[in-house]
Amino acid sequence: MNQLQQLQNPGESPPVHPFVAPLSYLLGTWRGQGEGEYPTIPSFRYGEEIRFSHSGKPVIAYTQKTWKLESGAPMHAESGYFRPRPDGSIEVVIAQSTGLVEVQKGTYNVDEQSIKLKSDLVGNASKVKEISREFELVDGKLSYVVRMSTTTNPLQPHLKAILDKL
């Protein structure tokens, strides 16, 4: 489908780009619950929704939002792009609602349906030094773990969640 056809038929999705195809299982909306911890804060639980979408280009758009389970009040949001390559490498850029930005690089494994990322750059963050993310599809559920290091704490688990596809 060319750009003119897409403009004329905006409800139709373009074909998935070949670079995106190995990760097409991510496409759609996922919702569930997660929990967070870190030595400097009290543990917490949250609701979460992640959406992965595509435009026919070699990139996956990513949006995420979280909320307090008790009240539904918004907590955190971020958005960005996943750029998979045919060799199994992937680059991810994320902008968080806190102003922090991440450039992550890593790999994806088609057979294991997993993605492993490590920060190449963490910007606009005086205390955060490194962030890693691991995503995995198990029994139709998307799980992830986010690890973080700061100026005072080594890399360790910070967030984890299990999400169901809607």
UniProtKB/Swiss-Prot annotation:
Reported function: Heme-binding protein able to scavenge peroxynitrite and to protect free L-tyrosine against peroxynitrite-mediated nitration, by acting as a peroxynitrite isomerase that converts peroxynitrite to nitrate. Therefore, this protein likely plays a role in peroxynitrite sensing and in the detoxification of reactive nitrogen and oxygen species (RNS and ROS, respectively). Is able to bind nitric oxide (NO) in vitro, but may act as a sensor of peroxynitrite levels in vivo.
GO cellular component, one term: cytosol
Family, similarity comment: Belongs to the nitrobindin family.
Intervals of motif GXWXGXG: 28-34
Binding residues annotated for heme b, in chain numbering: T40, H158
EC top class, as a word: isomerase
Organism: Arabidopsis thaliana
Keyword S-adenosyl-L-methionine: no
Entry text on domains: Forms a 10-stranded antiparallel beta-barrel structure able to accommodate a hydrophobic ligand in its interior. In fact, this fold hosts the heme group, which is located in a wide surface cleft.
Name of protein: Peroxynitrite isomerase Rv2717c
Subunit note: Homodimer.
Cross-referenced SUPFAM superfamilies: Lipocalins
